[in-house]
Amino acid sequence: MTPDLAPDPLEPAKPLGGLTGPQINLFNAGIAEFNKRDEVKADGLGPRMNLDSCASCHAHPDVGGTSPPDLNPQFDFYEKNLQKTNRLPRFITKAGPVREARFKLNPDGRTPDGGVHSIFIITGLKDADGCVLQQPDFARQLRRKNVIFRIPTPVFGAGLIEQIPDQVILDNHATKRGNAYGIRGRVNIINAGHALTARENRNGNDGTIARFGWKAQNKSLLVFAGEAYNVEMGISNELFQTEREEDPKCQFKPTPNDTTKPDQTGLDVLSDIEKFSAFMRFLAPPTPSQAEPGGADSISRGKKLFVKTGCALCHAPSLRTGTSTVAALSAKEVDLYSDLALHDMGDWLADGISQGQATSREFRTAPLWGLGQRIFFLHDGRTRDLKRAIQEHRSPGSEANRVVRQFFNRLTQSQQQDVLNFLRSL
């Protein structure tokens, strides 16, 4: 079998069809900001960060995707800018993936941490008297088995996902009750202050169904953008106003770095995170291939087997958006292959991190559209092998255990290849 076969990229990142001229202009302003490399003085980069631009993480197969292969932007960022002042942790390699590191427990070894510990630091600033920064001791934490990783989630079609009403998600969930596969699941409802770490940070989650991030920890694209800007690049903003560095001697600016600019005109009024969210909101989903890999007949058979084996109970083929003021997002079928709910994935995939109502073993069903171009699989990018990623779902205690063990694994080799071809066509 060839589980790692993917067709050539079908098309670059593009806006949704049906957008108006002003909406296209907003999309273009957003993608420009998404691609921009932020700087320390001009933008407030750091003093702790993982990279210096959104597009560095979300790069494959194009802007808005996930971790690129072959040349890890974190490795490149270190070599070009930070070799004299930073150590490169052994889990950041040239071949990738891009990684975010979180510690499961605090230094006392008992209480939960769960927060992001940025890989790189900015040092040597002339106006930073008294500020002494050190990188986390990743080697020690790795020995303690206290480090877990996350890779970037793709944001293709994210505006369509944002427009799916809560009730549609709940109604779809209700159809699973009493199924013979052991699939349960639940939605993640998060209130302000509990999506990032245990620390209070009034970030806009308001008790509606959250749906973005590996654990569905963010309710909206604006919250998703604000958190990422703060956590991955150290840039405070109107939603996440607290610097990632807690030492008061390293608090260089008492107000957020990124804000709305009422003294400007046109789109320049908008904050960076508003532009990021607009780009993601208007970014089109991938177009599936009708014939690659394996041919149209194989893909068609694989799609039917995907449903028959129970995979589609979590990876729901389609949900529908509600009414939107943006016609391109209103009343659309969204072929995302996700129910946007949390599911218990068992011990093999558990990461020891809770976010909102999501426990250490629960993850949002990852949308499968765009899978044909994905290189790294699962939340931590542990494998490039699609079939292994499927097998990881049969972890003891996983809701998907029976689906994989009793249904997928009993397919013939030819049938399994059809399923893989279908997945790689998405």
Give the role of each language-model region.
Residues 1-426:
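Periplasmic c-type cytochrome electron-transfer domains
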